[in-house]
From Swiss-Prot:
InterPro entries: AAA+_ATPase, ATPase_AAA_core, Chaperonin_ClpB, Clp_ATPase_C, Clp_N_dom_sf, Clp_R_dom, ClpA/B, ClpA/B_CS1. Signal peptide: none annotated. The lineage of its organism: Bacteria, Bacillati, Cyanobacteriota, Cyanophyceae, Synechococcales. Residues 560-771 are annotated as: NBD2. The Clp repeat (R) domain probably functions as a substrate-discriminating domain, recruiting aggregated proteins to the ClpB hexamer and/or stabilizing bound proteins. The NBD2 domain is responsible for oligomerization, whereas the NBD1 domain stabilizes the hexamer probably in an ATP-dependent manner. The movement of the coiled-coil domain is essential for ClpB ability to rescue proteins from an aggregated state, probably by pulling apart large aggregated proteins, which are bound between the coiled-coils motifs of adjacent ClpB subunits in the functional hexamer. It is found in: Cytoplasm. PANTHER family: ATP-DEPENDENT CLP PROTEASE, HEAT SHOCK PROTEIN 104. Pfam families: AAA, AAA_2, AAA_lid_9, Clp_N, ClpB_D2-small. This is Chaperone protein ClpB 1. Residues 342-550 are annotated as: Linker. Residues 772-862 are annotated as: C-terminal. The keyword Membrane does not apply. It comes from Parasynechococcus marenigrum (strain WH8102). Homohexamer. The oligomerization is ATP-dependent. GO terms for cellular component: cytoplasm.
Length: 862
């Protein structure tokens, strides 16, 4: 026959074209069967898969075909054209007969292979040498293509579809590749129950991301392998479908549907032996439905309803609502299994089950206290994710962090290395000098280098020894895991002799060695001389949480304890004259960091009342500075911007359908990004009353739902509200101690008139800031002058202010109504401006001291 592209499938024709190019490259005049056989093998496609099924080593077989080809006579140069040889012509005729025998429309790869197996020139000889007969080849072809017929020019895409587009979870469970599944018995039992139904035997697992939906299916695969399932599921295959691979590369209309049909056909023809698992099943809805093509879910519906296809789906609550509930016909074919977040004790059990896997992977030990801390701390502090996923991630990252420390050079050795490098450079420099001082220094350096060299070598030896011991421990754990897998496989195959030999011989020996190695390491860890740690502790977990969220949950070290105990004194140094306010704020922070504050409420919520300029906002800034080392580290909401009713949406985000829905709220977004913060609501009385309705949940439950439906956690925030309400009463009665109760009563009446009782009742404390006395203003002068001095230091100038000048500034800046702000203006006017003019006029140069004194009702600067 004269071959044309229309007679062949795409891959078969590509092989013939490749064979022609191979003949030209080999300088052969005729195109023969060995060229075609080698071209088929080099395709790395169906021919190789079929031959592998017969037990042939394809690489070795390809080498033998190449050797046969090299023995053919060749021309001196590549021919312009290649002629079809008699053997190949006959082989193509036989391939045509095979096509008709299979009832196919096109000559495919398998027809060519069968034709070449009957080739007297070389094919029969080469294949029989490899142990392949026509019958074994036919069996392999049937195994690969099943009972499908070739009706288009790309049939290879539909062969072994499940192997190409799926992953066998039962095979993975058999090989020990899946993590153990702890708990979830109720959900697995319900899934098995639904799968055992006659029709609509399709469970869909619905739950939040990270609660363990895929793990339930993996648990089912492990139960199938262990035979721990009812008769209806015994020896079944559980295959997970990769929707991405199914869609990828489907260029033409109908190609995706063809692939999916091939997968579904394989599943249905297996007579219930295959259970399909589609993770993220909502991707099936609308998949492939572009330009008039059919939606993938419509291909599934008839099979799902009749019970021909047993399918497990998994999706989140939101995706199920958005995609699957919109298609009631698809929804009714699936039975819902709701998967809730496990409790903290359940999560601890799950972590204990996974512990060994993570220890083997990272080569470190994980303390049980670290697992408990991971479950409890992640539950409390990581509120936007779900257990057990977030707890597992914490353990994983903590172990990875410790492993990185083990493999990196210890700090002690690194410091010595740097010191040696520094001294070597100094030695090199001094070697060129001839004076006695340099020579003396050189001798000292050489002595120091000798000492450091000894330290370096002993520490390096110790490091390598400790590292080797840890690596040995890790290798033993890996070996134990491998032997345990062999024991399980032997028990499944009823090879009890081998199982007993492994379990009571090899495994027992390995476990004894492991115990000895662990005891040795524990003895070394007991001393303070070790360079490496090899156990993940709860402190490691706390440090990782602090990195993730910015919330300081690590165990308090001595320096931080002292810092917290001194917090009140530090705040007093910056906020003058407001003892009650400073004490209340410091107490709240100390309660929180000691772990005694209510986990379901903010750390503290205060309403600061008082006249303007007495330190309400300054105290908030001082607190932010002490906690986060920056005045700007607080979230400041100016309530004067929320005077209209509609501005509530700016705080928590616009509702769906409104402009700015995607942007989120100013308050909620700030807290989501920085959960540990000081939040200042400045001038609250200026805001619209409806704004306070939003704050009720924040103050009481430490949470609020933003415009996008996300719950934002405020339990690690300090809420400070400032207001000028009642400031007139404070000014009138503050000076007289006897009138203090009357003043508080009048302020409370003013508060009740402005704010609702449910709002006031939720605040931890309402603190009245007194108006400032003249003595306190004198201390504020010292603070302000100190700040000016630090600014002058940048210009290499010093500032000396006499006591008389300080008293004079306090006198002219004293105004009970306006607090400390007039003082600030007085310092700017009387002190900063003259100094600035003197600098600009060139009267002050670097290194000078600015002397400030007072006389004749003004300051004198020299």
């Amino acid at each position: 026959m004269q071959p044309t592209a229309e007679q062949f499938t795409e891959q078969a024709w590509a092989a013939i074209v490749a064979a022609q190019q191979l003949a030209q490259a080999s300088r052969h005049q005729q195109l023969e069967t060995e060229h075609l056989l080698l071209a088929l093998l080099r395709q790395n496609g169906l021919a190789g898969r079929i031959l592998s099924k017969t037990g042939v080593d394809v690489t070795t077989f390809e080498a033998s075909v190449e050797g046969h080809l090299q023995r053919l006579p060749s021309l001196g140069s590549a021919p312009d054209s290649v002629f079809l040889g008699r053997s190949l012509n006959k082989a193509l005729d036989r391939a045509e007969q095979r096509r008709d025998g299979f009832g196919d429309s096109f000559i495919a790869i398998e027809h060519l292979l069968l034709a070449l197996a009957e080739d007297d020139r070389c094919g029969r000889q080469l294949l029989s040498q490899a142990g392949v007969t026509t019958n074994t080849l036919k069996e392999a072809i049937t195994a690969v293509r099943g009972n499908q017929t070739v009706t288009d020019q790309n049939p290879e895409a539909t062969y072994e579809s499940l192997a190409k587009y799926g992953r066998d979870l039962t095979a993975a469970a058999r090989d020990g590749q899946l993590d153990p599944v702890i708990g979830r018995d109720e959900e697995i039992r319900r899934t098995i129950q639904i799968l055992s139904r006659r029709t609509k035997n399709n469970p869909v697992l619905i739950g939040e991301p990270g609660v363990g939906k895929t793990a339930i299916v993996e648990g089912l695969a492990q139960r199938i392998v262990n035979g721990d399932v009812p008769q209806a599921l015994q020896n079944r295959q559980l295959i997970t479908l990769d929707m991405g691979a199914l869609i990828a590369g489907a260029k033409y209309r109908g190609e995706f549907e063809e692939r999916l049909k091939a997968v579904l056909k394989e599943v249905t023809t297996s007579d219930g032996q295959i259970v399909l698992f589609i993770d993220e099943i909502h991707t099936v809805v609308g998949a492939g439905a572009s330009g008039g093509a059919m939606d993938a879910s419509n291909l599934l519906k008839p099979m799902l309803a009749r019970g021909e296809l047993r399918c497990i789906g998994a999706t989140t609550l939101d995706e199920h609502r958005q995609h699957i509930e919109k298609d009631p016909a698809l929804e009714r074919r699936f039975q819902q299994v709701l998967v809730d977040q496990p409790t903290v004790p359940d999560t601890i059990s799950i972590l204990r089950g996974l512990k060994e896997r993570y220890e083997v992977h990272h080569g470190v030990r994980i303390a049980d206290s670290a697992l408990v801390a991971a479950a409890m701390l992640s539950s409390r502090y990581i509120t936007d994710r779900f257990l057990p996923d977030k707890a597992i991630d914490l353990v994983d990252e903590s172990a990875a962090r410790l492993k990185m420390e083990i493999t990196s050079k210890p700090e002690q050795i690194d410091e010595i290395d740097r010191k040696i490098l520094q001294l070597e450079m100094e030695k090199l420099s001094l070697g060129r000098e001839s004076d006695s001082a340099s020579q003396e220094r050189l001798q000292r350096i050489e002595r120091e280098l000798a000492e450091l060299g000894e330290q370096q070598s002993s520490l390096n030896a110790q490091w390598q020894s400790e590292k080797g011991a840890i690596d040995q421990l890790s290798a033993l754990k890996e070996e134990i895991e491998r032997v345990q897998l062999q024991v399980e496989q032997a028990k499944r195959n009823y090879d009890l002799n081998k199982a007993a030999e492994l379990e009571y011989g090899t495994l027992a020996t390995l476990q004894r060695q492991l115990q000895e190695q662990e005891d040795l390491l524990e003895d070394e860890d007991g001393t303070d001389k070790t360079l490496l740690r090899e156990e993940v502790t709860e402190d490691d977990i706390a440090e990782v949480i602090a990195k993730w969220t910015g919330i300081p949950v690590a165990r308090l070290v001595q320096s931080e304890m002292e810092k917290l105990l001194q917090l009140e004194d530090d705040l007093h140094q910056r906020v003058i004259g407001q003892n009650q306010a400073v004490t209340a704020v410091a107490d709240a922070i100390q309660r929180s960091r000691a772990g005694l504050s209510d986990p379901n409420r903010p750390i503290a919520s205060f309403l600061f009342l008082g006249p303007t300029g007495v330190g309400k906002t300054e105290l908030s800034k001082a607190l932010a500075n002490r906690l986060f080392d920056s005045d700007d580290a607080m979230v400041r909401i100016d309530m004067s911007e929320y005077m209209e009713k509609h501005t509530v949406s700016r705080l928590i985000g616009a509702p769906p359908g409104y402009v700015g829905y995607e942007a989120g709220g100013q308050l909620t977004e700030a807290v989501r990004r920085r959960p540990y913060a000081v939040i200042l609501f400045d001038e609250v009385e200026k805001a619209h009353p409806d704004v306070f309705n939003v704050m009720l949940q924040i103050l009481d439950d430490g949470r609020v739902t933003d415009g996008q439906g996300r719950t934002v956690d405020f339990t690690n925030t300090v809420l400070i509200l400032t207001s000028n309400i009642g400031s007139q009463s404070i000014l009138e009665l503050a000076g007289d101690p006897e009138q203090h109760t009357a003043m508080e009563q009048r302020v409370n009446e003013a508060l009740k008139a402005k704010f609702r009782p449910e709002f006031l009742n939720r605040l931890d404390d309402q603190i009245i800031f007194r108006s400032l006395e003249k003595e306190e203003l004198r201390r504020i002068v010292s603070l302000q002058v100190e700040r000016l001095r630090s600014r002058l230091e940048q210009r290499k100038l010093d500032l000396q202010l006499s006591d008389i000048a300080a008293d004079w500034l306090a006198t002219i800046g004293f105004d009970p109504v306006y607090g400390a702000r007039p003082l600030k203006r007085a310092i700017q006017r009387e002190l900063e401006t003259p100094i600035a003019k003197a600098i600009l006029a060139g009267q002050l140069s670097e290194g000078q001291t600015v002397q400030v004194d007072a006389g004749d009702d003004k300051l004198s600067i020299s």
